[in-house]
From Swiss-Prot:
It is found in: Vacuole. It comes from Nicotiana tabacum. GO terms for cellular component: extracellular space; vacuole. Belongs to the CRISP family. Three disulfide bonds are present. Pfam families: CAP. Probably involved in the defense reaction of plants against pathogens. Its main location: other. Residues 38-156 form the SCP domain. This is Pathogenesis-related protein 1C.
Length: 168
């Protein structure tokens, strides 16, 4: 009787553990889907009256390839490629798709649309790329670095942040 009870408890524990693992895995994946990237971007764009971005698999492949190259040391160095680009880094599971875009959009507080400038000593180019009216396609990737952190790369087509031009 004790063996049967132990066996049932072991089976229950195993099934419970597997179920928890699947829920956590799905939750982590669900927080980094194409739709998560699009929703975060398009909410910011709608706030300033800019049309939504669409997902582009070719742009996403570029983002994935470049982010994978950065994974060795996790240094945020821009690719200077054919697309506009935003990069973010975070430790652990903190850096989700939505969190990366939120970090970029939080730069809005430093952007003055009337003068098309950033506040002195501040950065706002990530924000302006997110809301750049002429950028209509996006592709993003999230890669774990060798040091355990994560890099998120989003690329935009056509690129934004054209000097002297307003994003919207």
């Amino acid at each position: 009787m004790e063996f049967v009870l132990f066996s049932q408890m072991s089976s229950f524990f195993l099934v419970s553990t597997l179920l928890l693992f699947l829920i956590i895995s799905h939750s982590c994946h669900a927080q980094n889907s194409q739709q998560d990237y699009l929703d975060a971007h398009n909410t910011a764009r709608a706030d300033v009256g800019v049309e939504p971005l669409t997902w582009d698999d070719q742009v996403a492949a570029y983002a994935q390839n470049y982010a994978s190259q950065l994974a060795a040391d996790c240094n945020l160095v821009h690719s200077h490629g054919q697309y506009g680009e935003n990069l973010a880094w975070g430790s652990g599971d903190f850096l989700t798709a939505a969190k990366a875009v939120e970090m970029w959009v939080n730069e809005k507080q430093y952007y003055a649309h009337d003068s098309n400038t950033c506040a002195q000593g501040q950065v706002c180019g990530h924000y302006t790329q997110v809301v750049w009216r002429n950028s209509v396609r996006v592709g993003c990737a999230r890669v774990q670095c060798n040091n355990g952190g994560y890099i998120v790369s989003c690329n935009y087509d056509p690129p934004g942040n054209v000097i002297g031009k307003s994003p919207y």
